[in-house]
Amino acid sequence: MAMSLRVVVPPHPLIGHWLTMLRHRETPPALYATALQELGRWLTYEALRDWLPHRREPIPTANGDTEGLVVESRAPLLAMPVMPGGLELWQGGRQVLPEASLCLNGVPDSIETNAGLVIFIDQITDGHAV
């Protein structure tokens, strides 16, 4: 897995919906928290679409043999929420990445070469501040 910074802005209607809930000034606190979690889940799903390591594997089914996709669990995944809102985004993201290691104090000093790092941050940045 190559190390690179990628910004993904998926044109998904559910992402647009939850982003609208976050931006609306009259959104109640409980709905705001739900919107952050849902946005975290959908953005994580979309960000991993072409990035999550996987392999094709033959599998037996009731109708005969076929080929399926299996996620490679050998590549460690790290999740780093930037406080405070990043933790709420991670609450949604962990539904997609339940096996990811949580990094609450920044990136560990030593990580494996093939490790993937997903940063959960609730701010828009110019790319130089991350």
Task: Annotate each PLM feature.
Residues 1-130:
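PRPP-associated nucleotide enzymes
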